[in-house]
Amino acid sequence: VVLPVLRDLGEGWREDPGLIAAEHFATNVLRPRLHRLLAGAHRAAAPTCLAAAPEGEDHELGVLAAAAVAADTGFRVTYLGSRTPRAALERSAATLRPDVVLVGAVGVDPARGFCADPPDLGAAALVVGGPGFAALDADALPAGARRAGDLAALSRELGAALGADGVTG
């Protein structure tokens, strides 16, 4: 419910620049609540998920909400945040060796940039989501990537990604 409202606020600033303040306020209220959901969901024997927004993506609430869904689904999540450089994502994937990497983008340009030069994520399954990735043709996505249509479908995609890679968690 909240993310579509934030998206409308974010798009409405073109007509009313005052809406930017409302979007920033709402973001600052929601961010710590979503982080608390992640902090309370650590499970030692759980499958692991690395979550980030790609380089150039300033909006983080979508991917943070997706990380919270992953945690609620049973994943132990490491959240890297917005504007994550490709090299940092690669290093994190090499170090943490997650079962799934979750990347979300609101903007088409950050999503397109990620797809044009995807990071080496090792054996991790890749799940992408958000309006930026939704706007791209399926053949523009990195090989093997799964696209989550919305947060409601995300837990199914995460489960399918685990099953496709033979990870039992």
Task: Go through the PLM ranges and name each one.
Residues 1-122:
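Conserved binding/catalytic microenvironments
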Residues 78-80, 127, 146-148:
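General small-molecule cofactor/ligand-binding pocket signal
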Residues 101-103, 125-132:
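Short, hydrophobic beta-strand segments that form beta-sheet elements in well-ordered domains
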Residues 131-169:
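Peripheral docking tails and interdomain loops at the edges
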Residues 121-126, 142-146:
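Structural alpha-beta junctions
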